């Protein structure tokens, strides 16, 4: 178990975790139609920053906002490790931007890059938990980010995977996913933040499975996702879970697979959080962005007495190309 001591989100919906949560609660979506964003690319629906962003500066701002908001002074410590979650970055050698980010903050340790398709943000948090629980570091700064490009958009278009309109996860008439841009940071520690008044969370469990089914299609039985859910639910039951943050891409096969996995795990009646209609698929940032918002949603449920004290667990699950599946369980107070 490790403690979240800080977090932030930067997206087209706003800067800061609270601003993004309020946008979601108000039903505001960042999705819109782009006709001339990239040369020689067909019109597409996505959630992009109005002003094109650069990858490294956006990551740096995300970390700076998180440490400033929570008045943390840990970035240049030998007890702190930086973990970058991204699927594309801005360089074929992803360790280069990771080093630039860590060096900006004067951190003496070699950063870690987690690039595991759409599950990267959850896998990065699992990596942080394992490093802290092993006693290798006291703090881990997990930053997730991806910026869209002509290469990415045209690639998904070639798969016929993009919806021409805002996505509709789990709808019978869903047409595919929308892409998105964001940067988000979660800071984990071996110990809780002293005198914290913030309703943060603990990271209790994590699991990664590969279903070895297909390079770009999930298991039709949801096997990998089910095994992840089974692992993170060890020691608890479905009635102790307040919320499940699903992947919910609105692609035909992913949503069908997730539905099967959730039912196999006995989670079909637990409330779900589906965030792609607000942010699009932010790829390497998705697991970080959506973990923060799921935890904040669950904290609000607890504060509003919508759930009892026993229902304080939150599960966040993701799946990705290559057959990878990942899930984590948080405990919110």
Residue ranges and their predicted role:
Residues 137-138, 242:
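Short acidic/polar active-site loop segments enriched in Thr and Asp
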Residues 121:
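Short conserved active-site loop signatures built around small residues
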Residues 104, 129-136, 296-297:
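Alpha-helix C-terminal capping segments
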Residues 138-139, 313:
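Short acidic donor-binding loop at the edge of a beta-strand
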Residues 1-111, 149, 162-178, 184-186, ...:
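Conserved "HGTGT" condensation-loop signature of ketosynthase/thiolase-family condensing enzymes
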Residues 153-162:
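Short acidic, glycine/proline-enriched helix-loop-strand junctions
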Residues 124-125, 187:
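Active-site alpha-helical elements of protease catalytic centers
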């Amino acid at each position: 178990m490790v403690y979240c001591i800080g977090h932030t989100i930067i997206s087209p919906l706003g800067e800061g975790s609270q601003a993004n949560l309020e946008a979601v609660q108000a039903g505001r979506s960042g999705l819109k139609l782009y006709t001339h964003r990239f040369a020689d690319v067909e019109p597409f629906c996505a959630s992009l920053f109005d002003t094109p962003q650069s990858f490294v500066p956006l990551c740096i701002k995300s970390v700076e906002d998180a440490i400033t908001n929570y008045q943390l002074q840990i970035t240049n410590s030998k007890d702190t490790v930086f973990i970058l979650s991204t699927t594309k970055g801005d360089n074929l050698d992803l360790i280069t931007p990771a080093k630039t980010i860590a060096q900006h903050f004067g951190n003496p340790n070699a950063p870690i890059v987690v690039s595991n398709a759409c599950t990267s943000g959850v896998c990065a948090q699992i990596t942080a938990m394992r490093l802290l629980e092993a006693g290798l570091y006291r703090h881990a700064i997990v930053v997730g980010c991806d910026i869209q490009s002509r290469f990415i958009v045209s690639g998904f278009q070639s798969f016929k995977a993009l919806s021409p309109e805002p996505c509709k996860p789990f709808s019978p008439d869903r047409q595919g996913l929308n892409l998105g841009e964001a940067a988000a940071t979660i800071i984990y520690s071996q110990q809780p933040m002293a005198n914290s008044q913030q309703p943060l969370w603990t990271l209790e469990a994590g699991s990664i499975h590969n279903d070895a089914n297909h390079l770009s299609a999930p298991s039709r039985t949801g096997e990998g996702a089910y095994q992840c859910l089974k692992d993170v639910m060890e020691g608890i039951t479905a009635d102790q879970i307040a919320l499940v943050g699903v992947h919910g891409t609105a692609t035909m096969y992913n949503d069908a697979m997730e539905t099967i996995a959730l039912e196999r795990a006995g989670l079909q009646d637990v409330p779900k959080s589906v965030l792609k209609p607000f942010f699009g698929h932010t790829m390497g940032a998705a697991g970080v962005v959506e973990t923060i918002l799921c935890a904040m949603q669950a904290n609000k449920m607890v504060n509003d007495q919508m759930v009892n004290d026993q229902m304080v667990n939150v599960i966040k699950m993701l799946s990705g190309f290559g057959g990878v599946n990942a899930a984590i369980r948080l405990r919110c107070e």
